[in-house]
Amino acid sequence: MARIAGVDIPREKRVVISLTYIYGIGTSTAQKILEEANVSADTRVKDLTDDELGRIREVVDGYKVEGDLRRETNLNIKRLMEISSYRGIRHRRGLPVRGQKTKNNARTRKGPVKTVANKKK
């Protein structure tokens, strides 16, 4: 397995697909990376030369991926919570942040149903 940005990418898959195993790189970003590194998108990872892998690594190092990206998103959420913005309060309470209704659904964000006794009638 080739290692790029601290992630083992699968050898049997095409380079475009295997780059998406890195957190922060989707298909369009993977295509841009390969274009910058002058590597064909159709080649398999096992067929890449060391030179091509090195060029891909250099280009990926220019992007914010994996741990750095996760850290930045967590810090952004913490900052929202510290300044007590509306979004920060929603994060703190574990409710949907982007304006969704919560009367009926939002179970993923709120967690399992907490049954209240004698609610009927």
UniProtKB/Swiss-Prot annotation:
<dbReference type="InterPro" id="IPR001892">
    <property type="entry name" value="Ribosomal_uS13"/>
</dbReference>
<dbReference type="GO" id="GO:0003735">
    <property type="term" value="F:structural constituent of ribosome"/>
</dbReference>
<dbReference type="InterPro" id="IPR019980">
    <property type="entry name" value="Ribosomal_uS13_bac-type"/>
</dbReference>
<dbReference type="InterPro" id="IPR018269">
    <property type="entry name" value="Ribosomal_uS13_CS"/>
</dbReference>
<dbReference type="InterPro" id="IPR010979">
    <property type="entry name" value="Ribosomal_uS13-like_H2TH"/>
</dbReference>
<protein>
    <recommendedName>
        <fullName>Small ribosomal subunit protein uS13</fullName>
    </recommendedName>
</protein>
<keyword id="KW-0820">tRNA-binding</keyword>
<comment type="subunit">
    <text>Part of the 30S ribosomal subunit. Forms a loose heterodimer with protein S19. Forms two bridges to the 50S subunit in the 70S ribosome.</text>
</comment>
<comment type="function">
    <text>Located at the top of the head of the 30S subunit, it contacts several helices of the 16S rRNA. In the 70S ribosome it contacts the 23S rRNA (bridge B1a) and protein L5 of the 50S subunit (bridge B1b), connecting the 2 subunits; these bridges are implicated in subunit movement. Contacts the tRNAs in the A and P-sites.</text>
</comment>
<dbReference type="GO" id="GO:0015935">
    <property type="term" value="C:small ribosomal subunit"/>
</dbReference>
<comment type="similarity">
    <text>Belongs to the universal ribosomal protein uS13 family.</text>
</comment>
<dbReference type="GO" id="GO:0000049">
    <property type="term" value="F:tRNA binding"/>
</dbReference>
<dbReference type="GO" id="GO:0019843">
    <property type="term" value="F:rRNA binding"/>
</dbReference>
<dbReference type="Pfam" id="PF00416">
    <property type="entry name" value="Ribosomal_S13"/>
</dbReference>
<feature type="region of interest" description="Disordered">
    <location>
        <begin position="91"/>
        <end position="121"/>
    </location>
</feature>
<keyword id="KW-0699">rRNA-binding</keyword>
<keyword id="KW-0689">Ribosomal protein</keyword>
<dbReference type="GO" id="GO:0006412">
    <property type="term" value="P:translation"/>
</dbReference>
<dbReference type="GO" id="GO:0005829">
    <property type="term" value="C:cytosol"/>
</dbReference>
<keyword id="KW-0687">Ribonucleoprotein</keyword>
<keyword id="KW-0694">RNA-binding</keyword>
<dbReference type="InterPro" id="IPR027437">
    <property type="entry name" value="Rbsml_uS13_C"/>
</dbReference>
